[in-house]
Design a protein with these regions (language model features):
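Proline-centered helix-kink/hinge sites
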Residues: 39, 82, 125-127
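Gly/Ser-rich helix-loop-strand patches that form or flank binding pockets
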Residues: 89-132
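Small/aliphatic-rich secondary-structure junction motif
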Residues: 2-53, 58, 65, 71-74
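Conserved residues at beta->alpha junctions
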Residues: 13, 77, 102
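Conserved beta-strand termini and adjacent loop/short-helix elements that scaffold enzyme active sites
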Residues: 40-42, 76-80, 131
Length: 132
């Protein structure tokens, strides 16, 4: 097998505990491989009153952490349900790896694997790392 090449990591981020763990691992991988991180928070599942500016407030702390670590960072805020938004953003930004938390902020937090992570695993065209 050849060398692993990771230039862009797409992080699915919702502010949950598992998403924070995923963010830490994404940062570590980005530093190791010199990769950029695209922080993705799809908000199509949120109430109509939710605005992209509110989503930015959610993702800004993690973006600032990455920036302080010297990691090139972009933000993607697709207006799609989470799994589809992550998959669309991964394709749009040509991500080499998707990193997501195993369980998000959904109402079924006791499930073995969250529905978003499961759908991303099933349909992604690039490797997916699920963090718990």
């Amino acid at each position: 097998m050849g060398d692993v090449v990771i230039r862009k990591i797409l992080l699915g981020y919702d502010g949950s505990e598992d998403a924070e763990k995923a963010a830490a691992l994404a940062a570590s991988l980005a530093q190791k491989y010199g990769a950029a991180i695209i922080v993705c928070h799809a908000f199509g599942h949120m109430p109509v009153t939710t605005k992209p500016s509110e989503v930015r407030r959610l993702v800004n702390p993690v973006v600032e952490r990455f920036t302080k670590l010297g990691i090139a960072t972009q933000v993607a805020i697709p207006d799609e349900i989470p799994a589809q938004g992550i998959l669309s953003a991964a394709e749009e930004y040509q991500a080499d790896l998707i990193v997501v938390g195993g369980r998000g902020r959904g109402t079924f937090a006791n499930l073995l694997l969250g529905s978003t992570a499961e759908r991303v695993l099933r349909f992604a065209k690039v490797p997916v790392l699920v963090v718990r």
